[in-house]
């Protein structure tokens, strides 16, 4: 299995400004495997410490701040060798170990020769607490579910993945690539990007095992809900979680608390929702009132949409059977195209630093699914789960903000093309959105300059 984050980890290793690393990511997204694989590939040896399996190791961080003494005790207790710059030290399951996290300050200041990477589930929750990590003394990195490109690599389709990465002009994709990529994307909707269900499919073609793996991950997340410090929030978190398919099945996907429970109010459930956001189990996309910078200045905090961390988990949570894979475009269009919208958001979050927003207006109603910030430009994005689509909302958006929009973007089942200032990206090329937007802008600017 190949994870593209390994390239980022190598950059971290070679950086002259390297600090201890905290790798964030949801449970079972592949944090431990990635760090161990990184150590295997690029270090002489790896020293691995799991504070959930060996809680007694926590004591070495509670009695001293001397990093040499801490490492000496860990080596004596575990029998593992630690050599500066040649050993990758992995501290796993650190979410309940504030002393371990805080010790990164001393490793950064007093022992930069040691290469340390920390990981843990629910780290977003732990790091949201005051004084839970040393500001400015650590590097952060986020690992998300496997992208469609990574799914192709895991499935043995290196040729398709390489082709997608090689596209350097905006022109239609040949049928020899378009059709198989379209079919592979449908399967990605079924498995999602969590490594275990992907493995069950790519290595064994075992649909039942893949389904069980997805159910197991969902069950693990639901058990984590009970870890909220205020136990009364547990049922609220659970109800919000289970309402997500219903929220996304609506024509207007704006999050409505009454869908969670009849009579529910924001003030009663907002803490529970924030827990899910901090855990990164869901993505919160605010409504923007206008395409301005900084984007946060134009947020309507009372209106937002909620998406799941992974499209495969959403399919399983919504109880959509894998057999939909063989039913034409059903996976793309089922419950108002929610799987497609969720999938596109996943890819945008991994490519763009600023979390996407969406835009809408009433009377008459128009909605642009996402607004993305690329450098200092805002691009409206529409997601269509079919081909031969029209973009009324994109047209309206340009009418309202003609001077702020260089390019409009549409994801659909249509082929790659640039029609005036509308870039159509096939859904299977969503991972290449940033690159394709750049190419489209160059092509558009080139045409404009040729007119003079």
Question: What are the functions of these language-model segments?
Answer:
Residues 1-16:
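Pre-Walker A adenine-sensing motif
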Residues 13-21, 28, 37-41, 271-452:
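A cross-kingdom feature that marks ATP-driven nucleic-acid transaction machinery
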Residues 31:
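Conserved lysine of the Walker
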Residues 53-84:
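Short glycine-rich substrate-engagement loop in P-loop NTPases that contacts/grips substrate
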Residues 82-99:
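Conserved P-loop NTPase "ATPase switch" module shared by AAA+ and STAND
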Residues 90, 115-121, 142:
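Structural recognition of the conserved hydrophobic beta-strand(s) that form the central parallel beta-sheet
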Residues 124-140, 152-157:
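Short regulatory helix/loop adjacent to the ATP-binding pocket of P-loop NTPases
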Residues 153-346, 356-363:
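Interdomain hinge/linker elements that couple catalytic modules in large macromolecular machines
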């Amino acid at each position: 299995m190949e994870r593209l984050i390994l390239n980022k980890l190598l950059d971290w290793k070679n950086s002259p400004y390297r600090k201890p690393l905290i790798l964030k990511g949801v449970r079972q997204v592949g944090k431990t495997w990635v760090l161990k694989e990184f150590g295997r590939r690029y270090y002489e040896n790896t020293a691995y410490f799991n504070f959930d399996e060996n809680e007694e190791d926590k004591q070495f961080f509670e009695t001293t701040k001397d990093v040499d003494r801490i490492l000496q005790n860990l080596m004596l207790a575990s029998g593992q060798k630690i050599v500066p710059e040649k050993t990758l030290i992995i501290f796993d399951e650190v979410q309940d170990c504030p002393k371990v996290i805080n010790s990164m300050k001393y490793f950064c200041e007093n022992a930069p020769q040691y290469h340390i990477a920390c990981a843990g589930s629910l780290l977003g929750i732990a790091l949201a607490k005051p004084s839970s990590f040393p500001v400015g003394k650590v590097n952060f990195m986020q690992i998300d579910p496997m992208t469609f490109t990574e799914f192709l690599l895991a499935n043995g389709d290196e040729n398709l993945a390489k082709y997608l990465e090689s596209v350097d002009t905006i022109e239609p994709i040949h049928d020899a690539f378009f059709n198989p990529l379209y079919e592979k994307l449908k399967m990605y909707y079924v498995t999602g990007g969590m490594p275990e269900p992907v493995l069950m499919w790519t290595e064994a073609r075992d649909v039942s095992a893949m389904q069980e793996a997805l159910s197991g991950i969902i069950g693990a997340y639901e058990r984590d809900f009970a870890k909220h410090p205020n136990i009364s929030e547990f049922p609220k978190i659970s109800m919000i979680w289970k309402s997500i398919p219903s929220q996304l099945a609506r024509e207007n996907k704006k999050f409505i608390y009454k869908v969670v429970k009849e009579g529910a109010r924001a003030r009663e459930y907002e803490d529970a929702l924030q827990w899910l956001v901090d855990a990164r189990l869901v993505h919160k996309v605010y409504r923007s009132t206008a395409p301005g910078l900084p984007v946060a200045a134009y947020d309507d905090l009372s209106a937002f949409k909620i998406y799941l961390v992974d499209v495969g988990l959403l399919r399983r949570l919504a109880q959509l059977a894998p057999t939909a894979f063989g039913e034409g475009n059903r996976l793309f269009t089922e419950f108002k195209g929610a799987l497609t919208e969720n999938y596109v958001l996943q890819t945008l979050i991994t490519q763009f630093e600023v979390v996407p927003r969406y835009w809408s207006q009433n009377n008459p109603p128009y909605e642009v699914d996402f607004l993305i910030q690329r450098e200092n430009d805002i691009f409206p994005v529409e997601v269509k789960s079919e081909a031969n689509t029209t973009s009324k909302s994109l047209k309206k958006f340009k009418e309202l903000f003609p001077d702020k929009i260089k390019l409009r973007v549409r994801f659909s089942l249509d082929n790659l093309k640039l029609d005036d200032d509308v870039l159509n990206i096939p859904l299977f090329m969503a991972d290449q959105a940033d690159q394709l937007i750049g190419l489209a802008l160059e092509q558009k600017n080139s045409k404009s300059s040729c007119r003079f």
